[in-house]
């Protein structure tokens, strides 16, 4: 009979009965490809705390790197403050994403991470994770894969801002969200925007007025339906074409 003591220990220390083995987004996160023994070792270092409330920050720019954060539910935005004191959003993180990679190179966070809605995160002490990854090749490979995905996303964002017009930027943003929701088991055609239009405009380098005008244009063209923060994609193929995504790269 398998002992349940380690699990009991995790529940007491983390305050939550959900473990990596039971997590619905584990295939997108660090646990992917790990065997049961490796999962148990990872599970024992993860801290699961109370929900992060809307507006609450996981960390601030300048904070020492102590942990990486795996999002279990909710949405987190990453942003920096420019020399002029303006906020610049650099990423929107969904369930399954790992936040904090950019702090590894300098041992401190160069950006802020703030919850856009009530969110649940798994806090993973970085030094212990780094030590474990040296002993577990599969864990190291998965961390590298997650880092690679983040670099790929940054490259796509550079292309988006430098080569695409306003209409193409918003279409690409919505198509990307649709794809990410689908990967997480949610509907790729119906979803709620957890970020404001101001946040979207900030991220895409567009004004709030431009975002609102384009959403109205997309709705008039029957590409999508907009009801407040709720988006329904009516013509996925047309949105995909407008976003500049080929069927081969889908």
From Swiss-Prot:
InterPro entries: cNMP-bd_dom (IPR000595), cNMP-bd_dom_sf (IPR018490), Env_Response_Regulators (IPR050397), HTH_CRP (IPR012318), RmlC-like_jellyroll (IPR014710), Tscrpt_reg_HTH_Crp-type_CS (IPR018335), WH-like_DNA-bd_sf (IPR036388), WH_DNA-bd_sf (IPR036390)
Cellular-component GO terms for this entry: cytosol
Region ranges (Activating region 3B): 84
Region (Activating region 1C): 184-194
DNA-binding region, residue intervals: 200-219
Region: Activating region 1A, residue numbers: 74-78
Needed co-factor(s): [4Fe-4S] cluster
Region of interest (Essential for the oxygen-regulated activity), residue spans: 23-32
The protein's name: Fumarate and nitrate reduction regulatory protein
């Amino acid at each position: 009979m398998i002992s349940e003591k380690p699990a009991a220990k995790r529940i007491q220390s983390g305050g939550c009965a959900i473990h990596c083995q039971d997590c619905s987004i584990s295939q997108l996160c660090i646990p992917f490809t790990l065997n049961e023994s490796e999962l148990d070792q990872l599970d024992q270092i993860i801290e699961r705390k109370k929900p992060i409330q809307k507006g609450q920050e996981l960390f601030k720019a300048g904070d020492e790197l102590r942990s990486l954060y795996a999002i279990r539910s909710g949405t987190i935005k990453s942003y920096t403050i420019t020399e002029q004191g303006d906020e610049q959003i650099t990423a929107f993180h969904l369930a399954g994403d790992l936040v904090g990679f950019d702090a590894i190179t300098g041992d401190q966070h160069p950006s802020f991470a703030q919850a856009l809605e009530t969110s649940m995160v798994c806090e993973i002490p970085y030094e212990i994770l780094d030590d474990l990854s040296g002993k577990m090749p599969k864990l190291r490979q998965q961390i590298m894969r997650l880092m690679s995905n983040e670099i790929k996303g940054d490259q796509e964002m550079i292309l988006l801002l430098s080569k695409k017009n306003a209409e193409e930027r918003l279409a690409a943003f919505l198509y990307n969200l649709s794809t990410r929701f689908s990967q997480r088991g949610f509907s790729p055609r119906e979803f709620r925007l957890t970020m404001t239009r101001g946040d979207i405009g900030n991220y895409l380098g567009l004004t709030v007025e431009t975002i609102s005008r384009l959403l109205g244009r997309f709705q008039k063209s029957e590409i999508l339906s907009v009801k407040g923060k709720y988006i329904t994609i009516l013509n996925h193929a047309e949105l995909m074409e407008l976003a500049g995504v080929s069927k081969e790269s889908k």
